[in-house]
A protein has these predicted regions:
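Residue-level detector of alpha-helix initiation sites
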Residues: 5, 67, 105-109, 268, ...
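N-terminal leader/targeting and accessory segments in enzymes
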Residues: 1-85, 89, 375, 385
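C-terminal helical cap/extension that packs against the catalytic core
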Residues: 33-34, 350-402
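Short internal beta-strands
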Residues: 20-26, 204-208, 339-340, 359-368
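Phosphate-binding loop of NTP-binding sites
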Residues: 15-16, 51-57, 64-208, 212-223
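Nucleotide phosphate-binding/pyrophosphate-handling subdomain across enzymes
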Residues: 9-17, 255-361, 375-376
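Beta-strand->loop->alpha-helix junctions that form or flank phosphate-binding loops
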Residues: 45-48, 84-88, 222-240, 289-293, ...
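Residues in the short beta-alpha loop(s) of Rossmann-like NAD(P)-binding domains
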Residues: 4, 26-29, 131, 209-210, ...
Length: 402
């Protein structure tokens, strides 16, 4: 179900394994994916779901963008047909070690950084999940020794037997509340699924100062604990001391904070998680150090785009929830014109209220319905502007900042 990167990758793997495969997407299918399916002789349909074919399946692989409450998925479930994710399916057919990363914020940066370290170490490694090529397609085209897998809560929802040899949980803050019935515990439970099936010799890397993780941890079995925190505490696998980043296990080493290529407190935590994950995998400390120095960052994540007439333009469009906006604002050193918009997912903007008052000189809203944003920020006394295209939005920001 679904014919994007995830669904088509799963279809190719299933075809190569000898299964009868049918791909159905209620929306249009991109030409590149039609070509991929046609090249393998895989039957597909778009803009409809033919229930007679779908409900005849022995198993359904669901793309993460399709909610379990979608009418066709409810019919599939009612028919007793198992519904799994592409990651779950691909995991059955590889012996590669899985380093899996989730969290409300920092997933893409941390996943990319871990992948960078493994590549610098010369390992046979793939980048998959919510980033890069689908895991299933990589397994189909030629397996790896390691996969670095970014996992969203949507992907974790339909995973059951999959095992993360190294599970990384960066943080848990409200996100996708619309998808989880506006129930925070449902979202938390989805994130903690990353620990299911871990064995004692696996590793669980996590932010020790996250109150939700600390509260929930006792409910789950997991591998060996590798907590990280800004300040040292008993059992910390990484922490800071004075101007140094200290890694304590399995192989102790340290480096100066100013050597890290990524800046900001949130990126310090991302670097800790990545360094521990590589350390657990047995990568030499010299390689980890050098890779943490040389990493160039991720597109659209606090990406410095241009400096025009003394005004710096920063693209942080990967910040898709309130908490990630908080981290971005915290890192701003100058007065900021903040662009907010997109789909409201049950957001609580009170988390960024103090920083908006402190850091921002104007707010620009970009979205179909900005009423909630205007209602919340209207009393702040800041200039506010409605825009309806990115071109109009940037032009307005340019005027304000001059």
């Amino acid at each position: 179900m679904g014919a994007g990167e995830s669904g088509c990758g799963a279809a190719v793997l299933a075809y190569k394994l000898g299964f009868d495969v049918f791909v159905s997407d209620f929306g249009p299918i991109a030409d590149k994916y039609k070509e991929m399916l046609d090249r393998h002789g895989i039957t597909w349909e778009e803009r409809q779901h033919t229930e007679a074919l779908i409900l005849n399946a022995s198993e359904v692989i669901k793309s993460p963008g399709i909610p379990n409450e979608a009418p066709i998925i409810e019919k599939i479930t009612a028919a007793g047909i198992p519904v799994i994710s592409e990651i779950e399916f691909a995991g059955r057919y590889t012996r590669a070690k899985m380093v899996c990363i989730t969290g409300s914020n920092g997933k893409t940066t941390t996943t990319s950084l871990i992948y960078h370290i493994f590549r610098e170490a010369g390992l046979n490694v793939g980048l998959a999940g919510n980033i890069g090529k689908s895991l299933a397609l990589q397994v189909a085209e030629g397996d790896k020794d390691y996969y670095i897998v970014e996992l969203s809560s949507f992907q974790l929802d339909n995973m059951y037997e999959f095992r993360a040899n190294v599970a990384v949980l960066l943080n848990i803050t409200p996100d996708h509340m619309d998808r989880y019935g506006y129930n925070m515990q449902n979202y938390v439970d989805a994130k903690l699924r990353i620990l299911q099936n871990q064995q004692p010799d696996d590793a669980f890397v996590f932010w020790n100062d996250d109150p939700i993780i600390k509260k929930e941890l006792a409910k789950y079995s997991h591998g060996k604990l590798y907590p990280f925190a800004e300040k040292n505490h008993e059992g910390a696998a990484a922490y800071t001391h004075e101007e140094n980043l200290i890694f304590t296990e399995p192989t102790p080493f340290n480096m100066e904070l100013e050597e890290l290529s990524l800046t900001g407190k949130h990126n310090l935590y991302n670097s800790m998680a990545a360094g521990i994950s590589a350390n657990v995998a047995g990568i030499r400390k010299e390689t980890i150090r050098e890779a943490l120095r040389s990493f160039t960052g991720v597109e659209h994540r606090l990406e410095k785009v241009a400096m025009v007439n003394g005004v710096e333009y920063i693209n942080d469009s990967k910040a898709t929830n309130v908490n990630s906006c908080w981290y971005a604002l915290q890192s701003m050193k100058k007065k900021t014109v903040l662009i907010l918009g997109g789909k409201d997912k049950g957001n609580d903007y009170s988390e960024i209220a103090a920083l908006v008052k402190e850091k921002c000189c104007a707010l620009i809203f970009l979205g179909a319905d900005n009423s909630k944003l205007k209602d919340f920020f209207g009393e702040f006394g800041l200039p506010m502007f409605d825009t309806h295209s990115i071109k109009e939005c940037v032009a307005q920001a340019y005027k304000i900042a001059l």
